[in-house]
């Protein structure tokens, strides 16, 4: 296979449903790319990029177009390989969105949120312990009445009954947020939404602020987790496909082998890995696969944008494989932005879920709630092992100023196409 001059430095490897090759032509193009890069007159800079998983193939191609135009257009020595997650989570969920289970999810959440409006109409109070106790009793009474109404409604099915039962068994923080200090303000979006203004800790004499939409998010997470609905199985399948791709002779393992053969011919070649969201797990799998070969594992730059990796698994890969890198960079959203994301997950949960995909992964899609995710600021602010901090030369949370540059990034999904993020990343690739 002979690649066109414009495509010779940049190729896209598409994955099949099983993590293998979508088409043998992709494998042939990879081998042609390898031959081209190995014969370069100057030591090449090989960049392997993996996009996030919640996109269609068309959107994936569009993202890679932007990466090539903004990140690599002015760097002729960069030779770029992109993983194109051909059958992404987007398509999987789109196919499932009309299924009975998915309809149940939307119905359960909207029914409970709508009914909760009655419980939200508590009178304002001055925050004194005596008044708080009265409000608590009223809230519990309203919740029990709500439970009875839900059970008797003709439109209520068994799943909604179970969700209502779950309401009466909430852990203390959620009880405080959703019942002890239920706000009067009720905000309506596409689905009825209860806005929780604040909560009161039992050991505190004054109100302690709670996150906006805290109860909305908690309810969706509990329904998804409890009933193992399509998003859970889809997320597990996406991760399985990532790891399957790095089993020989599949695409991930083939790319690792190609890069190592190029470095044998071009010992001064540089290698950098970039991953966004699910792409962070691709980077981790690449490092693990390369480590198993026993060859030189030096990497120039590892850049993770809002990565969905387990914090523990990324630590393990680095510890076991002994990877050496010049710089590791992590950029993610501030926790305040993660908690205020509306409509990010369509068609996953549409307007029902008011937070980012990483919050849903951590609280509902992984095996245990509050599962530590590498790209979430909240887990870096909590006590974390020192070796986690030592893995990265720079950790940045946006929106904010990074290396003197203003970066206005407000959504989980837009990192790979944000000109400010890409300009910052380009400068770091050059400086390394």
Question: What residue ranges belong to the model's regions?
Answer:
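Proline/glycine-enriched tight loop/beta-turn segments at coil->beta junctions
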Residues: 37-45
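Short amphipathic alpha-helix adjacent to the substrate-entry channel of hydrolases
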Residues: 62-78
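Conserved strand-to-helix beginnings and helix N-cap segments that scaffold or border functional pockets
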Residues: 60-64, 284, 314-316
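Short substrate-entry loop that stabilizes the transition state in hydrolases
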Residues: 54-60
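Conserved alpha/beta-hydrolase
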Residues: 75-89
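Gly/Ala-rich beta-loop-alpha elbow adjacent to hydrolase catalytic centers
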Residues: 273-275, 279, 283
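Short beta-strand element of the alpha/beta-hydrolase
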Residues: 44-52
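Lipolytic serine-hydrolase domain surface
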Residues: 2-27, 87-145, 149-154, 169, ...
């Amino acid at each position: 296979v002979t690649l066109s001059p414009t495509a010779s430095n940049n190729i896209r490897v598409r994955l099949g449903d099983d993590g293998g090759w979508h088409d043998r032509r992709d494998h042939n193009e990879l081998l042609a790319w390898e031959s081209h890069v190995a014969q370069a007159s100057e030591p090449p800079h090989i960049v392997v990029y993996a996009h996030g998983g919640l996109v269609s193939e068309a959107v994936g191609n569009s993202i890679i177009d932007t990466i090539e135009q903004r990140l690599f257009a002015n760097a002729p020595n960069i030779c770029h390989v992109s993983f194109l997650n051909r059958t992404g989570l987007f398509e999987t969920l789109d196919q499932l969105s009309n299924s009975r289970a998915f309809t149940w999810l939307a119905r359960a959440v909207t029914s409970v949120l709508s009914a909760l409006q009655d419980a939200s109409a508590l009178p304002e109070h001055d925050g004194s312990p005596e008044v708080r106790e009265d409000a608590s009793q009223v809230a519990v009474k309203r919740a029990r009445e709500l439970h009875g109404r839900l059970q008797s409604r003709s439109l209520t099915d068994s799943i909604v009954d179970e969700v209502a039962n779950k309401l009466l068994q909430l852990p203390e923080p959620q009880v405080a947020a959703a019942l002890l200090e239920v706000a009067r303000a009720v905000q309506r979006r596409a689905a009825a939404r209860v806005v929780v203004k604040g909560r009161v800790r039992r050991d505190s004499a004054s109100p302690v602020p709670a996150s906006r939409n805290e109860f909305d998010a908690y309810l969706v997470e509990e329904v998804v987790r409890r009933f193992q609905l399509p998003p859970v199985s889809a997320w597990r399948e996406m991760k399985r496909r990532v790891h399957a791709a790095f089993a020989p002779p599949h695409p991930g393992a083939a790319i690792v082998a190609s890069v190592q053969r190029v470095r044998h011919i071009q010992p001064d070649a540089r290698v950098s890995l970039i991953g966004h969201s699910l792409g962070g797990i691709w980077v981790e799998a690449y490092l693990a696969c390369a480590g198993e070969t026993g060859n030189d594992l030096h990497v120039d730059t590892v850049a993770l944008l809002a990565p969905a990796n387990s914090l523990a698994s990324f630590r393990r890969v680095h510890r076991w494989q002994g990877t050496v890198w010049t710089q590791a960079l992590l950029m993610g959203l501030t926790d305040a932005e993660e908690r205020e994301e509306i409509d990010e997950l369509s068609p996953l949960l549409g307007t029902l879920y008011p937070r980012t995909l990483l919050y849903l992964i951590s609280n509902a899609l992984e095996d245990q709630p509050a599962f530590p995710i590498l790209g979430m600021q909240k887990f870096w602010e909590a006590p974390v092992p020192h070796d986690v901090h030592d893995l990265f030369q720079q950790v940045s949370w946006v929106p904010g100023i990074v290396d003197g540059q203003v970066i206005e990034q407000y959504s989980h999904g837009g990192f790979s196409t944000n000109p400010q993020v890409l300009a910052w990343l380009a400068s770091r690739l050059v400086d390394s």
